[in-house]
Amino acid sequence: MAIVKRGVRTKNKQSQQPSKSGIKKAEFDLHKKKEVGVSDLTLLSKIADDAINDNLYKRFMNSTIYTYIGHVLISVNPFEDLGIYTPEHLNKYKGKNRLEVPPHVFAIAESMYYNLKSYGDNQCVIISGESGAGKTEAAKQIMQYIANVSVDDQVSAGGDGGISKIKDMVLATNPLLESFGCAKTLRNNNSSRHGKYLEIYFNPSNYQPVSAHITNYLLEKQRVVSQITNERNFHIFYQFTKHCPPQYQQSFGIQGPETYVYTSAAKCINVDGVDDSKDLQDTLRAMQVIGLSQDEQDNIFRMLASILWVGNVSFVEDDNGNAAVRDESVTAFIAYLLDVDAETLKTSLIQRVMQTSHGMRRGSTYHVPLNIVQATSVRDALAKGIYNNLFDWIVERVNLSLQGSGAVQEKKSIGILDIYGFEIFEHNSFEQICINYVNEKLQQTFIQLTLKAEQDEYVQEQIKWTPIDYFNNKVVCDLIEALRPQPGLFAALNDSVKTAHADSDAADQVFAQRLSMVGANNAHFEDRRGKFIIKHYAGDVTYDVAGMTDKNKDSMLRDLVEVLSTSSNSFVSQVLFPPDLLAALTDSKKRPETASDKIKKSANLLVDTLSQCQPSYIRTIKPNQTKRPKEYDNNQVLHQIKYLGLKENVRIRRAGFAYRTTFDKFVQRFYLLSPKTGYAGDYIWQGDDVTAVHEILRSCHIPDSEYQMGTTKVFIKTPETLFALEDMRDKYWHNMAARIQRAWRRYIKRKDDAARLIQSAWKNKTHGNQFEQLRDYGNGLLHGRKERRRMSMLGSRAFMGDYLGCKYSSGFGRFIMSQAGISDSVIFSAKGDILLSKFGRSSKRLSRIFILTKNSLYVIAQTLVQNRLQVQKEFTIPVSGINYVGLSIYQDNWVAVSLHSPTPTTPDIFINLDFKTELVTHLKKCNPGLNIKIGQTIEYQKKPGKFHTIKFIVGNTAPVNGDSYKSGTVTVRQGLPGNSQNPKRPRGAAGKVDYSKYYNRGSNMRSTSSYQPPAVSKAPQSSRPSYIQPPVQQTQQRVVPPVQSQPKPQAQRYAPPDTQPQTQRHAPPDTQPHAHPEQAAQAAQAAFHHTAPQAQNTTQRKVPPSAPGSYGQQAPTQKPSAPSRPARKTAPAPPAKKNVAPPPPPAAASPPPKPKFPTYKAAYDFQGTGSASELPISKETIVFITRKEDNGWWLAKTLDETKEGWVPAAYVVECDPPANSPAGNAKSPPPPPPQLNSASQAQQSQQQAQAPNGAGLSNGLADALKAKKSEETNLAGSLADALKKRKGATGDSDEEDEEDDDDW
């Protein structure tokens, strides 16, 4: 993303709060293994080789083969299929950073692909380790992951563009090049006998894979003609000879592998775990995917057949002691396969053509016969030359298919290096020194890019750092490749070949003589007469001098090239052996390039390529030499741990930094995370990059210990911090979109609420309130026949019906519906009690849930089974089967539901319900023929055919707001007359619209981040903290303070509304406007079913009282404002100055008397719960505090000492006494009356004399309305207290008379 600078906007913007964090749904991983050891070696308590080895052993035996050292992956070859490369495992690593998932090669691949897309840097992975450690498999899995992920990203984005074809071709290179370039060795069944560097190129605009390229390094062509015992030739020869396609068997004369010398001499044809038939099918399929035509495939297999038959050419000695072909039919068949003259081919195998020259003149030509040894060498050179050129052509042909359209000029790449591992055999020759040289170069690259480069960078950037010693193998690389000041081994080989070009034995002797000069004063080299030792980083290796110079020549005899150039097959004469190759051999002025020159050039080019990329590292370890699973050789692994330098890597990683980048790149990447550097996606910072980096890190709350600032770069210490930054950046646009969506939804919600409010008001105006109409209908059913409760006669009482919220999509009511299996529409739902007689026991009053639908009345029971809530339908009573309902004439809540034909499963029920009148009303609506019996007694059938009568009496022993049941008798207090009517619903207090419910309640949440920074205090920008909000009325259980006459209040803290929203109180029913029926139902249910706790939880956390604004954060203390004073009169102008003595100073005013109680000011509005023991106060009201309790309640008294009550300690702050307080101005004349700006001052003015004028009349009317409202509030507020006392006396079981005990 390019930085586009824009000037700072002049519009004053509110500080944007971080978006509310979202938590992803947790998923249980069935395949997750138990963690064994540590997944990152930097977490080891002891840094030692033995500790590393022990940790790797534990994880290996648990089939956990991957471990991290920071961002370096350690892989131990399991020698078995663990099932960890399936598509399911691959999908688990998509879009995940390495800390979210277990260590895996897929995590390295994901990190490479993410860095490529995010930062635009070329990526590469360097896979190192000895032969058989699993390098090839790791490279294959990385290719598999990147190919799949890059294609999936483009397909999900809605486009393909041929990338699937590129993916298939990239993956097809694995089986094709493995067949032609890998073989079975003593250490590895699939050992790479060549080096391969695959680069996948991506379009930088959309990171779509557009092409690929493979670079080949030093094929071990000697393996074509000879192998060590129990090793094999290249895989393709066994695949071809064992399962040759039918069309090739006749035309190419292919037989079994035991027929040919090149495939049978090592006595190893079959390998355990290798299916040559399947591998051949994969190879043929890969050829088709890459795009090889049928003619090209025929020519490939023709060349393979030629090589096999060339190996079967044998020689005998003629009469002159020269070599002769034993069976000329074999050479004739080879000539047929190569399309050359048979006699010419035979002659080139047993004779050598030599030419002499004299200056510029052409000399003589000689035909020199060869002996058997020389002829065998020429035969093998022919086979090696054909296979080497064939392999090079296959790589070039694959690159031709992978190059794509080539329309994109600038490309980004991911490189995967799969190269031969370090080798130590009993006899080591030129191939081993080349392989080990390349591994030394890779080790040097690893050191330079990790250990040395990292420490050098810390010094250069002036970062605090403790240097760590390590072994730098540059001295070994110079021993092999150096030209000056002291020539290395490769230079000595080239000089030996140049000195004795014609005689290989003489050249070997010259090379042996030069070794003493090569290893002079070098501690890593030893000369051993015909052998020499090089002390590599992986161990000491002994090399044989014999045959090295001949292998270094790396060129075919001119005689053989001339024969092949005459082939009538263009694939042989033009493709494999083009004319320019013969011209180069003929030109005697130019020395042919040797094999050592090629490998040195290729290795240096590889190092240059890798140094231009951001590297990732995989260090592979071979656990044993037997290639058996679950076998761990401690000594062998410990040796690899030491020479790989894992201990030094762990030490540097623990002391180093996980991420570093230049200041400008960091700002360009993360400027969105700070409101000072980015706004709406634009870069608005006007300062330098260093300050911008500080602002970004400060805005993200990154501690100073997590980063250091260098001279040109910023260094992030832990990867967790980097992942947190990346996570916040990824979610930036999502949060911005969510913020816009919230604003739009608030706007729509506000319009919708306004429309609903208008519609509700209009419906109530024209048609009346349906819930109040239903209430009036129900009151008419009982009018004059039953005493009424005071709570039922409130003007705000309405029959809402569904008090449990069964109609909602979620919540308690919906839970009960789903558990009980009720699907019908609910008319009425509430909690209550039922009187049940148990077997052999007296009747007991039990809690139940009652749900009424159009057809049935359900009685729901809740039980705890093994601490789990079980909900079941206890009774299902059909509404049409109800004969009558029985009620008493008193104000109790009991009602009997009697059926026409009761059964044991559907009996008559005797229930206690706060909303009994409403239930009877709904039953009457559903069943118009229902009888309502009201009398002194209630009769119902406890069992079918057995009637039971309940008596009702009036007594003062009953609870004030309830009743008591004992032995078939219900005692209740006297209620309101039966002809009482509900007053009109009181109008809500006029005031401003509460827009706080439309505000963004998640605005105070920080941005989502896996990193949790410490809180950073900021200076407030206003006199009042922004996080303090007025209390929001909610229908939740309220806290009832104790009355003054009762003992000390319980340990219940009353916190301010901004710190404990869960304790916010709801308004009394008569003060809540019922704009929505659902909200009114919830409010009424919460009021009628409120029960006070019997005992407070003694383990509840106590919050010490403190001033508002200091709850968890630092807030400024707001001083109380002084009461308003009368306006001062303008002082008259001073008289003209005269020379008179100044008057004496006035006497000091007497200090105001100290009040007898400390004064406190209300920081919030406290409306109270309606209890008589509370003192409602308004904000800014000043009161006396006469008593302080430890439970959070303080006893307050108004300044005029006319009212006293309890207030929450967290709602008041200490302040100075006002100047007009009774204690503060007792000895001074009272000032003019202040303006009415508080509740206490309003009460004082109410007690003053009333003036008989219009103003006094209006004030009196206002006072009367306030008094009426206060009275109704107190009446409604005592509802919960009445219900609490009423229910408290009826919770236990009671004994019935003896008549009930014989029910069983």
UniProtKB/Swiss-Prot annotation:
The modification Phosphoserine is found at S364. Gene3D superfamilies: 1.10.10.820, 1.20.5.4820, 1.20.58.530, Kinesin motor domain (3.40.850.10), Myosin VI head, motor domain, U50 subdomain (1.20.120.720), SH3 Domains (2.30.30.40). It comes from the Eukaryota. GO terms for molecular function: actin filament binding; Arp2/3 complex binding; ATP binding; hydrolase activity; microfilament motor activity. Residues 36-730 form the Myosin motor domain. Keywords: Actin-binding, ATP-binding, Cytoplasm, Cytoskeleton, Hydrolase, Motor protein, Myosin, Nucleotide-binding, Phosphoprotein, Repeat, SH3 domain. SMART domains: MYSc, SH3. Residues 1141-1156 have a biased composition (Pro residues). Residues 1-12 have a biased composition (Basic residues). Residues 1155-1217 form the SH3 domain. GO terms for cellular component: actin cortical patch; cell cortex of cell tip; mating projection tip; medial cortex; myosin I complex; plasma membrane raft; prospore membrane. Residues 964-983, 1001-1012 have a biased composition (Polar residues). Its main location: cytoplasm. ATP binds at G129, E130, S131, G132, A133, G134, K135, T136. Residues 413-496 are annotated as: Actin-binding. Residues 788-978 form the TH1 domain. Phosphorylation of the TEDS site (Ser-364) is required for the polarization of the actin cytoskeleton. Phosphorylation probably activates the myosin-I ATPase activity. It is found in: Cytoplasm, Cytoskeleton, Actin patch. Type-I myosin implicated in the organization of the actin cytoskeleton. Required for proper actin cytoskeleton polarization. At the cell cortex, assembles in patch-like structures together with proteins from the actin-polymerizing machinery and promotes actin assembly. Functions as actin nucleation-promoting factor (NPF) for the Arp2/3 complex. PANTHER family: MYOSIN, MYOSIN-3-RELATED. Belongs to the TRAFAC class myosin-kinesin ATPase superfamily. Myosin family. This is Myosin-1. It comes from Debaryomyces hansenii (strain ATCC 36239 / CBS 767 / BCRC 21394 / JCM 1990 / NBRC 0083 / IGC 2968). The lineage of its organism: Eukaryota, Fungi, Dikarya, Ascomycota, Saccharomycotina.
